[in-house]
C-alpha cells in the first residue's frame, strides 16, 4: 500500500506565511499582536520550548512579551505575574509554561488567566465553550494540539465525517479535548476514547479508521493493532535511551513498522509538533483580529 507522510513542518510553514500577512494587515490598522510567556524555573525542556515559541513569533511579526521567575517563586509571585500579563496591553495572549514547580497548584494559576488572553485555549471558560458549541463557529481560543491535528488532516483532505476515530490517552492537553472537537457537527466523527482502564484496547484500535495516539508510551501502536489503510496521528512523546548512540531520543507512540500498513501517517518528530506551535500563533492573531 502506498502510504502518505503527513508533513507537519510544511503545513505549519504555510500557516505561518498566512499569519504573517494577517499580522501586516493588523499593523496597518495600528494593532501589534503580542504573545506573552511566563516561565518559572530553568527546566531545559521548558526553556527550549519557550525559546522556540518566541522564534516563531519573530517569523510572523508577533511581539514577544517574556516573564521569567526563579524556581523557588511562590504561588503569590506567579499569580502576580499572571495578573500583570492580563493587564499588559502589549500582550494579546499568553501562556503559562507547564509544568510549574512542585507544590504550585497549576489549575489555580490557569484559572487566573483572562479567558480572552488564553493563547493555549485551556482556560476552564474556553473549554466550557468548546463543550457547549457543538454547532456553528467557536469564537474562543481552541486548544492548540487538537486544533493542529484537525488542521493537518484537513490540509491532506482526510475527511473525518462518519469515520471511527480511536483516541489513545485521556489527558486534557489532547485526549479529552480532541474528542470534543472531533464530535462537533463540522467534523462529525465517531470517537472511542481509550485509557488505562479500557479493556481490549487493541480491539478498538483495529476497528478505527483513524488512530490519534497520545499516551506517551513509545511504540505502543504496532502493525498487528491497526487495520489496513488506517490513518495514524502520533502525538506521543517519550524519552528513550538509545544504546548505540549513548543518549536519549524522542520517540512517539506509533512504531514506524506501521507506516507501510497505513494510508497516511504523521512522523514523530515533524508531524503534530510544528502544528501545535503554529496554532498558538494562530490563536494570538485571531485574538488581535477580534479586537480590530
Curated annotation (Swiss-Prot):
This is Bifunctional protein FolD. NADP(+) binds at residues 169-171, 196, 237. The lineage of its organism: Bacteria, Bacillati, Actinomycetota, Actinomycetes, Bifidobacteriales. Keywords: Amino-acid biosynthesis, Histidine biosynthesis, Hydrolase, Methionine biosynthesis, Multifunctional enzyme, NADP, One-carbon metabolism, Oxidoreductase, Purine biosynthesis. Catalyzes the oxidation of 5,10-methylenetetrahydrofolate to 5,10-methenyltetrahydrofolate and then the hydrolysis of 5,10-methenyltetrahydrofolate to 10-formyltetrahydrofolate. The keyword Oxidoreductase applies. It comes from Bifidobacterium longum (strain NCC 2705). Homodimer. Pfam families: THF_DHG_CYH, THF_DHG_CYH_C. One of its GO terms (biological process) is L-histidine biosynthetic process.
Amino acid at each position: 500500500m502506498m502510504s502518505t507522510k503527513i508533513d507537519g513542518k510544511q503545513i505549519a510553514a504555510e500557516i505561518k506565511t498566512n499569519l504573517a500577512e494577517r499580522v501586516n494587515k493588523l499593523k496597518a490598522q495600528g494593532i501589534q499582536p503580542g504573545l506573552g510567556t511566563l516561565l518559572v524555573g530553568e527546566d531545559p525542556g521548558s526553556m527550549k520550548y519557550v525559546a522556540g515559541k518566541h522564534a516563531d513569533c519573530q517569523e510572523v511579526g508577533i511581539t514577544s512579551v517574556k516573564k521569567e521567575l526563579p524556581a523557588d517563586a511562590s504561588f503569590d509571585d506567579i499569580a502576580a505575574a499572571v495578573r500583570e500579563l492580563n493587564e499588559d496591553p502589549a500582550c494579546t495572549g499568553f501562556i503559562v509554561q507547564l509544568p510549574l514547580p512542585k507544590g504550585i497548584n497549576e489549575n489555580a494559576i490557569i484559572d487566573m488567566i483572562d479567558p480572552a488572553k488564553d493563547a493555549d485555549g485551556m482556560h476552564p471558560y474556553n473549554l466550557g465553550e468548546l463543550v457547549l458549541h457543538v454547532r456553528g463557529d467557536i469564537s474562543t481560543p481552541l486548544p492548540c494540539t487538537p486544533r493542529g491535528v484537525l488542521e493537518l488532516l484537513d490540509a491532506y483532505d482526510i475527511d473525518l465525517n462518519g469515520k471511527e476515530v480511536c483516541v489513545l490517552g485521556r489527558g486534557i492537553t489532547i485526549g479529552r479535548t480532541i474528542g470534543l472537537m472531533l464530535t462537533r457537527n463540522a467534523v462529525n466523527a465517531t470517537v472511542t476514547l481509550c485509557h488505562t482502564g479500557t479493556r481490549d484496547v487493541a480491539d478498538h484500535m483495529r476497528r478505527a479508521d483513524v488512530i490519534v495516539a497520545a499516551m506517551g508510551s513509545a511504540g505502543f501502536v504496532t502493525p498487528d493493532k491497526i487495520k489496513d489503510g488506517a490513518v495514524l496521528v502520533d502525538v506521543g512523546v517519550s524519552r528513550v535511551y538509545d544504546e548505540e548512540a549513548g543518549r536519549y531520543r524522542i520517540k512517539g507512540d506509533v512504531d514506524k513498522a506501521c507506516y507501510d500498513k497505513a494510508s497516511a501517517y504523521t512522523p514523530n518528530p515533524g508531524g503534530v509538533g510544528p502544528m501545535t506551535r503554529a496554532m498558538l500563533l494562530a490563536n494570538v492573531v485571531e485574538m488581535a483580529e477580534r479586537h480590530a
